[in-house]
């Protein structure tokens, strides 16, 4: 397994995801989205596995003005706006090769090889 966890250090679900893999002695790479966001390729891969860009955005987030701006941005510009503002992406994003999840999903992770 090649696990990557994209999240923030303050996010409780990200901390729970890290704990899940540590308890099972599964090595993972943590990527702090405040320091280094996702590349366009990484984002597209995760979005494709999770039902598209709309599902990647945490519409319940704190920055309502930014979320409203993204919501009404033209579809062709939406991806760039989300990549410029990684704080709107649901976390943690956990990747294992082509497989990925959004949020804390231990039942799915247990099935990964």
Predicted regions located by residue number:
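Local sequence-structure signature of Cys/Sec-based thiol-disulfide redox active-site neighborhoods
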Residues: 1-24, 28-33
């Amino acid at each position: 397994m090649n696990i990557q966890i994209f999240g923030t250090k303050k996010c409780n679900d990200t901390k729970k995801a890290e704990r899940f893999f540590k308890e099972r002695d599964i090595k993972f790479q943590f990527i702090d989205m405040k320091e280094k966001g996702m590349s366009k390729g990484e984002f597209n891969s995760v979005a494709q596995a999770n039902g598209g860009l709309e599902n990647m955005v945490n519409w319940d987030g704190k920055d309502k003005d930014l979320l409203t701006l993204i919501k009404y941005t033209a579809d062709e510009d939406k991806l760039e706006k989300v990549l410029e503002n990684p704080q709107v992406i649901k976390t943690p994003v956990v990747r294992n090769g082509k497989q990925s999840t959004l949020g804390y999903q231990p039942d799915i992770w247990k099935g990964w090889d």
